[in-house]
Amino acid sequence: MFDPAVFAARRDAFMKVLGPSGVAVMRSLPERLRNGDAFHPFRQHSDVFYLTGFVEPDTTLVLRPGAETERIVMFVRPRDPEVEIWDGRRAGLEGAKETYGADAAYTTAELPTRLWELIANHEELHFSLGLDDQMDLLVGSAIARLRKSEKRGKRPPRAVVDPRVALHELRLHKRPEELVALRTACRITCEAHVAAMKLGRPGVSEHEVEALINYTFRKAGGSGPGYATIVGAGDNATILHYIENTRAIADGDLVLVDAGCEFGHYTADITRTWPASGRFTAAQRKVYEVVLATQKSAVAMAKPGVTIDELHDHCVRSLTEGMIELGLLTGTVDERIADSTYRKFYMHGTSHWLGLDVHDVGAYTREGKARPLAPGMVITVEPGLYIARDAPDVPAELRGIGIRIEDDLVITEAGNDVLTAACPKEIADVERACAR
């Protein structure tokens, strides 16, 4: 969906960081078997996509900023009319050059024989060890061959550096075209959540709600969910990453849905919790109001200069106050934070980066300190309370209640812009959306 110039600009920015003496080798993962001879749907490695827009498996990108020729080299699957009848069209070598910006393109099968020359005589090799055993062996073999060739003027790189440090810094700061994709993903996701609220009444199964959500993603032009859709009814909502989605929704249940559409490889990440009956009970309303007030105040805090740690600390304090008011905890707020007892009911972080990956890349610290938010960063804000059905020493009417409210924000010069504002979260708006 992006113009080739977008990917060219990204490569230029990354190669500027590499410098003329650096060479980067980046590999997509191969297709993975699901079972038998059936494969999982392939999704390109986010780093490779960010730099190329190329979506086929078995791809290797080599960047050589200081080279006079072959600065951008791609190893790809060749065109094969017979195979393409079965598995779909390929870009091939010409497509890699004409469409994806490669100066030179070779077949994936040629990588073992050509890699050593491409990395020769560079000071630093930027390569991520430990991600792909086969690729580690290829790179190791190339370096070993160069060590044997030093007397003939072909020397190996002096150091191996992880390219993700520099590349993920670029990915952390979203460009305008990325925000367009994220806004679209968020808009579609909001539509899917509202549709789920209307469907998810007693007697409907969790998997029916999941099916409607994923259908809405695809119908609106998304590629599908950016991660496994969570539909947790009743006490299933107290399981953070519940993805079985097999239970029938019962009268009196709350339904927690955590779902995000992927659009143009960028994913949204929204959580909403709503009453299957269409109206919150008094107990559900009390817990929901605690989470909602906490979430809204944290969203209001998010601006340049504030850290994710500060957002989390704020939510911990606000939720702990609520836990005491609800009768979940006793003592003072400071005592319960100091001994971490609050983690019985709020055990996860408040925010994470969002982008090509649902838990997107980028360091949360700089020079040992929490990193301040800056314009162009996209984050989630997602506090919650999870009261297990067998939780001891808590009011009986609160057991089995799980509530999370999550929005996606882009940090701006003036503060933040909530990308998911169209998704209902106020009690009256949620109940209105649930009306059938």
PLM features per residue range, with description:
Residues 1-436:
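Active-site neighborhoods and metal-handling regions in enzymes and metal-associated proteins
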